[in-house]
Amino acid sequence: MMLEHVLVLSAYLFSIGIYGLITSRNMVRALMCLELILNAVNINLVTFSDLFDSRQLKGDIFSIFVIAIAAAEAAIGPAIVSSIYRNRKSTRINQSNLLNK
């Protein structure tokens, strides 16, 4: 019974993250939605790691690596957004065409 609740929560977080990532026009909101997706993946990793083999910590250790990557993204992402804002005076995704040239 608990497994279904955790998987529904994870699917709900993942769906909100994907929906927000697709529909957001603001870079900060897109970064927040990406964090939701990574957290949903972490919940699944820990849940299935405990379900299949509770003696080994492979899923837990892998989720720690995903958390470290998310922390790096949370540190570098806003710096990139603030740099784009200083140059373009906007954080809208559709107005950012720095890589098109």
UniProtKB/Swiss-Prot annotation:
Catalysis performed (reactions): a plastoquinone + NADH + (n+1) H(+)(in) = a plastoquinol + NAD(+) + n H(+)(out); a plastoquinone + NADPH + (n+1) H(+)(in) = a plastoquinol + NADP(+) + n H(+)(out)
This protein's encoding gene: ndhE
Organism: Illicium oligandrum (Star anise)
A GO term for molecular function: oxidoreductase activity, acting on NAD(P)H, quinone or similar compound as acceptor
PANTHER family documented for this protein: NADH-UBIQUINONE OXIDOREDUCTASE CHAIN 4L, NADH-UBIQUINONE OXIDOREDUCTASE SUBUNIT ND4L
One BP annotation, GO: photosynthesis, light reaction
EC annotation from Swiss-Prot or TrEMBL: 7.1.1.-
Subunit structure: NDH is composed of at least 16 different subunits, 5 of which are encoded in the nucleus.
Family affiliation: Belongs to the complex I subunit 4L family.
Pfam family, one: Oxidored_q2
Function: NDH shuttles electrons from NAD(P)H:plastoquinone, via FMN and iron-sulfur (Fe-S) centers, to quinones in the photosynthetic chain and possibly in a chloroplast respiratory chain. The immediate electron acceptor for the enzyme in this species is believed to be plastoquinone. Couples the redox reaction to proton translocation, and thus conserves the redox energy in a proton gradient.
Membrane topology label: Multi-pass membrane protein
GO cellular component, one term: chloroplast thylakoid membrane
Keyword field: Chloroplast, Membrane, NAD, NADP, Plastid, Plastoquinone, Quinone, Thylakoid, Translocase, Transmembrane, Transmembrane helix, Transport
Segments traversing the membrane: 2-22, 32-52, 61-81
Top-level division of the source organism's lineage: Eukaryota
Protein name as catalogued: NAD(P)H-quinone oxidoreductase subunit 4L, chloroplastic
Location(s), subcellular: Plastid, Chloroplast thylakoid membrane
Enzyme class of the recorded protein, top EC level: translocase
